[in-house]
């Protein structure tokens, strides 16, 4: 059933504007857009504005698309007031803070949704369906390499590349494999915090022995988002390896964003708001917190 929701928006930059337009298309009315002019000298939203607009009697949910370092405080502010939250990735910049937000949402019986749009990418969803069928037959004899690189951008410089890019691919990984079954074998991040590599082993469960590699670079010469699949040769495994591009490229080699990824995540959030798929929603929030835990594990510089 379609409802006319009221919301507030924290941060009206590139992603904030995109989220606002998608929600407004679904008849969501934004009562207040908090941006730089609404901050006090300490960089926090002025208390008088919070008291005026951030109330569950006035709004149904909050959209948080402010700098990543503010996600935890704004999400906590809203969840404590009984307001559901749609927040850009990463959920927080510390694993403990991310878990705190998940627990707070459960305790207050409100929705916490992390906008990790790649999880709603139709290309990935199709890949995941077929890949999980393949490894059902192949057992644990596989290796995945997630690679995500793009040219320098001034956006998202308040966090390192792990919290900026790696969380995308960790969230994809966690939609296929259990967090409890994973072990980080190696994690290095460059001194300029623009490039990182992570190696994860699946150490428990049906796919124990499989390997997952992650490479991210936000100051690269190329623009690429791929998953490479490699199978160990056995009678059970497929006789081929392959790679999947999560985004098409234009004639200049630039990534073309798949619009249905954003559209699908907004539609799903609105389904959660009417009470549908609630258990899936809780698992997705926990997965987002687990992605932060992995992305903030003790690192080595290179």
Describe the predicted segments one by one:
Residues 1, 9, 61-66, 110, ...:
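C-terminal helix-rich "cap/oligomerization" subdomain common to oxidoreductases
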Residues 18, 39, 223, 238-240, ...:
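Active-site loop of classical SDR/Rossmann-like NAD(P)-dependent oxidoreductases
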Residues 19, 43-104:
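Beta-loop-alpha module in the N-terminal Rossmann-like domain of NAD(P)-dependent dehydrogenases
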Residues 158, 164-243, 267-276, 297-299:
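Contiguous beta-strand/loop segments that form the cofactor/metal-binding neighborhood of enzyme cores
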């Amino acid at each position: 059933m379609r409802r006319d929701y009221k919301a507030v928006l924290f941060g009206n930059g590139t992603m904030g504007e995109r989220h606002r337009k998608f929600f407004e298309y679904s008849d969501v009315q934004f009562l207040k857009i908090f941006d730089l002019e609404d901050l006090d000298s300490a960089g926090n939203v002025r208390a008088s504005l919070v008291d005026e607009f951030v109330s569950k009697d006035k709004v149904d949910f909050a959209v948080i698309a402010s700098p990543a370092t503010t996600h935890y405080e704004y999400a906590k502010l809203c969840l404590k007031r009984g307001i559901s939250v749609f927040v850009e990735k990463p959920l927080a910049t510390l694993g403990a803070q991310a878990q705190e937000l998940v627990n707070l949402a459960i305790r207050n019986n409100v929705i916490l949704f992390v906008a990790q749009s790649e999880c709603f990418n139709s290309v990935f969803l199709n890949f995941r369906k077929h890949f999980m069928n393949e490894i059902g037959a192949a057992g644990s004899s596989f290796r995945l390499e997630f690679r995500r690189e793009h040219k320098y951008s001034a956006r998202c410089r308040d966090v390192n590349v792990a919290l900026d890019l790696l969380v995308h691919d960790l969230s994809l990984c966690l939609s296929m494999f259990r967090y409890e079954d994973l072990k980080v074998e190696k994690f290095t991040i460059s001194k300029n915090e623009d490039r990182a590599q992570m190696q994860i082993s699946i150490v428990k469960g049906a796919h124990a022995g499989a390997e997952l590699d992650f490479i991210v670079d936000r100051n690269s010469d190329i623009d690429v988002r791929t998953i490479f699949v490699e199978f160990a040769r056995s009678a059970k495994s497929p006789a081929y390896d392959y790679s999947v591009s999560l985004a098409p490229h234009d004639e200049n080699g630039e990534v073309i964003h798949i619009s249905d990824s954003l559209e699908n995540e907004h539609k799903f959030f609105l389904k959660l708001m009417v009470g549908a798929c609630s258990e899936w929603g809780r698992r997705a929030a926990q997965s987002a917190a687990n992605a932060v835990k992995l992305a903030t594990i003790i690192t080595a510089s290179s």
